[in-house]
Structures are given as structure tokens and as C-alpha cells.
From Swiss-Prot:
GO molecular function, one term: structural constituent of ribosome
Cross-referenced PROSITE patterns: RIBOSOMAL_L16_1, RIBOSOMAL_L16_2
Lineage per the UniProt record: Eukaryota, Viridiplantae, Streptophyta, Embryophyta, Tracheophyta
Similarity comment: family membership: Belongs to the universal ribosomal protein uL16 family.
Subcellular location: Plastid, Chloroplast
Name under which the protein is recorded: Large ribosomal subunit protein uL16c
BP GO annotations: mitochondrial translation
Region (Disordered): 1-22
CDD domains reported for this sequence: Ribosomal_L16_L10e
UniProt subunit comment: Part of the 50S ribosomal subunit.
GO cellular component labels: chloroplast; mitochondrial large ribosomal subunit
PANTHER family given in the database record: 50S/60S RIBOSOMAL PROTEIN L16 (PTHR12220), LARGE RIBOSOMAL SUBUNIT PROTEIN UL16M (PTHR12220:SF13)
Alphabetic keyword roster: Chloroplast, Plastid, Ribonucleoprotein, Ribosomal protein
Length: 134
């Protein structure tokens, strides 16, 4: 699973996902990409599941770039705990994704292989996405 090596602070506010993505919304490395159409938190497990699905489907051909990184800690309180007594401890990491953000890129394969691999990765995501070609 992806997670930061170290962070300045252990816990973060939840924040808001307003507007569209102004950074990371163009294809930079590969020829094909998966683009988010909705705002969401994508967990490190979901990112890894999508990456594995793409890698398995493409087999040894091509190269895959993961364009998002889970850098936001999500805290959870233990089950059956009374209210108060502070914020819960960090449980997992998420990447904050806004509409327009590129999630994965792929290159070095034909379009139909890329489309199939990226559609498998898209099925692992909790949001609507689209396949784009540079």
C-alpha cells in the first residue's frame, strides 16, 4: 500500500472537494489515461487494486504510471467508544481526487489492450471515470 514516509502532522482536517482539478489533469507520460469525472477520496488500497488489475491485464507489455498519491490520513475512532476524548488515530491514507484529475497513465501498448486494462482499473475505483487518449 502507498503511504507517505513521514508527514509534518499526524492528523488532518477532512476538508472540502470544491471545483475541478487544476493540476494533474493532462497526460504527461503515456499515451492513454484514466480520468476522474467526480470528486472523491481514493484509498491506497483502491489505487493498488487498480494498478494490479492493469499490470495483470497488460502482462509484460507497456508501462504504467500512477498519477495520484495518498497523502491524507483518515482517522477512525475505536468501535463502541463514547463521544469526546479527542480525535481518533490514523487508520488509512487517501488521495483527494477532483473531477478532471488523471489517475493512471499507460504507454507502449496498443489501444485495445490499454482500453481493456484501464477499464479493469476503472471498475476498482469508487467514482465515474473516462478513458482518454493523448
Amino acid at each position: 500500500m502507498l503511504s507517505p514516509k513521514r508527514t509534518r502532522f499526524r492528523k488532518q482536517h477532512r476538508g472540502r472537494m470544491k471545483g475541478i482539478s487544476h493540476r494533474g489533469n493532462h497526460i504527461s507520460f503515456g499515451k492513454y489515461a484514466l480520468q476522474a469525472l467526480e470528486p472523491a477520496w481514493i484509498t491506497s488500497r483502491q489505487i493498488e487494486a487498480g494498478r494490479r488489475a492493469m499490470t495483470r491485464n497488460a502482462r509484460r507489455g507497456g508501462k504504467i504510471w500512477v498519477r495520484i498519491f495518498p497523502d491524507k490520513p483518515v482517522t477512525l475512532r475505536p468501535a463502541e467508544t463514547r463521544m469526546g476524548s479527542g480525535k481518533g488515530s490514523p487508520e488509512y491514507w487517501v488521495a483527494v481526487v477532483k473531477p478532471g484529475r488523471i489517475l493512471y497513465e499507460m504507454g507502449g501498448v496498443t489501444e485495445n489492450i490499454a482500453r481493456r486494462a484501464i477499464s479493469l482499473a476503472a471498475s476498482k475505483m469508487p467514482i465515474q471515470t473516462q478513458f482518454i487518449i493523448s
